[in-house]
Structures are given as C-alpha cells and as structure tokens.
Amino acid sequence: MSGMRTLGEFIVEKQADFPHASGDLSSLLSSIRLAAKIVNREINKAGLVDITGAAGVENIQGEVQQKLDVYANEKFKSALEARDQVCGVASEEEDEAVAFNKELNKNAKYVVLMDPLDGSSNIDVNVSVGTIFSIYRRVSPIGTPPTQEDFLQPGHKQVAAGYIIYGSSTMLVYTTGNGVNGFTYDPSLGTFCLSHENMMIPQNGNIYSINEGNYIRFPMGVKKYIKYCQENVPEDGRPYTSRYIGSLVADFHRNLLKGGIYLYPSTQSHPQGKLRLLYECNPMAFLIEQAGGLASDGVNRILDLKPTELHQRVPFFVGSTNMVKKVEEFLEVYRDEA
C-alpha cells in the first residue's frame, strides 16, 4: 500500500503533540499495541479453545468475570509493567489500583486506567468487544509508590485515551489531545496501519443507541427523548434509527463514524448510572470531544467531573453535539418528574 503508515511510525511522528515529549508516551502506547495483538489473537480462537464463558468469580462490581476478562487484564497489566513508563494501573477487574513496585517502574511518570475487555459477555455469541484505556501523568512525587490521587483525576487531565475494537477487523483508535486517529490491524503484516486519519463525528446524527428494554426504569426526560427520536418528522431526519449492540466500544465506534448518540442513563435500579467514570466514560469523553462531539452526565460535562472513588458510576450521554444537547434539554425540562 503506497504511503502506508504504521501505528509505530505515526506515534513517533506525532510525539511532538505531547507537551512533555520524551518518547515515554510513545513507548507506553507501544506496550498497549503489543497487548492488543496478543488479546486479539486469543479472541480469534474463541470457540476453538476453552477461553469463553464465565471464570467462576465476580469482580468488584459484582459482575461475573468471563475467562477472557481475566486473560485480557493480565496481558495488559504485564505489557504495561514491562516498560518503565507506568507506575500503576487501575482496572475494572481489580478491586484496588495496582502499584508496579519493580525497580524498572520506580521513576515512571504515568498511570493507566482500563477496561481490559468491554462487552466480554458477547464473546460467546461472536459479537464485537473492545478494550478501553486512559492515561494520566501521576501527581504524586516520582520515585514514590503511586497514590489514590494519581488515579482520581478529572478527565480533562488525561494525556491520552483510546480503545481497541475486536470486530470484523481489529482497530485501535486513540487521541493525545490533538485529534483522533484510527489504525486497522493487518494480520498478514502483524501491524496496525493508519486507516482513519483525523476522525470527526457529524454534528447531527440519525442513530440512537440505548437498551430500550429498560424503558420503564428510565427518567422521564430520557423517555421523552426516545419518543422524540421515534417521531415521524422527515424534514428533521426523524424517525431516527435505533441501533444497540450492548458493547460500549462497538456502539461508540459506529456512532463516531456515522453520527449518533449513545445513552446509558440512571435507572431505578442504578440511580448513579451503570458505566464507570474513570475507565469507560472519561476516555470515551476525551475521544468524542477531540472528534467534535460532546459527552455529558445529563447536566455536566463528563471531563469536568471530580472522581471520588475508583469504580464510580455515572449516567452517560455521548455522541453528536446536537443530539447530546437535545437530550440535555429534555432532562432539564422533566428533571422533577420520575
């Protein structure tokens, strides 16, 4: 392919985008790239070897861990610990943040938060899954163990974030705060190649993504917004199309490319929402804003929320700017109604 650029080449080219450019972030992203290849290889074996199904234990959220959750968590942790840029990680699959105590990691500048395998319950039925990651500069002194404060930073302090989607093709999409770029994995070469440069989400979309099976439990503002999406107003592009996969990465990726909104509101059973702020919502919010969209909890900008705990949950509305603004309007009008 003429002019093809690999992820490694692109990272080095764009190193100057990072305010403290020294090659550390490039090396960190390289470790994520390596782990993604390993996890991708294992996912592609699903159904051939005993890696699907439940692992028989629950994570801190009370969710049954899938075997591939555990596998992906260990591979990403190992890849990050093997470089000298990361002093600790926080993961959906770990009760507490994990400090890397090797001599190698003592002077590391970064912490990584991740959902190692989002949508893993879909593996058994061959539906797209993904990895989400978020990178911060530590705030504690270099040379000391990482602290809780290193991980509980608001999203606007992220220095990089991204996701890997394991689907019909495997893609890695990331930002360092200077636009969003996507790379497709070429298995014949064993490398990620630039396929989607400077990704931008349309300001308007015609796709809404929400689990309508929970409709009865939604806030009134969300119910009214869904009805708005379903109204027959051709001059306004409505009714919109409903598309919901049940894998955040897959739903987000489609809407990023096509234009749309993903909604996971609070419900009666989950009044604080269900998605985790630090390693699901913040990285996706960083990406969508860099792509020209918006991310909100229904009232506030996601990236401005101050985390108080590692596995904190929030309502989440993310996607095309005008669609997110519209759902915020409905939530404001019907705020006092159940």
UniProtKB/Swiss-Prot annotation:
Primary location: cytoplasm
Key words, A-Z: Carbohydrate metabolism, Cytoplasm, Hydrolase, Magnesium, Metal-binding
Catalytic activity, EC: 3.1.3.11
UniProt gene name: fbp
Cofactor: Mg(2+)
HAMAP family: FBPase_class1
Cofactor: how and how many bound: Binds 2 magnesium ions per subunit.
Catalytic activity: beta-D-fructose 1,6-bisphosphate + H2O = beta-D-fructose 6-phosphate + phosphate
Gene Ontology molecular function: fructose 1,6-bisphosphate 1-phosphatase activity; magnesium ion binding
Record's protein name: Fructose-1,6-bisphosphatase class 1
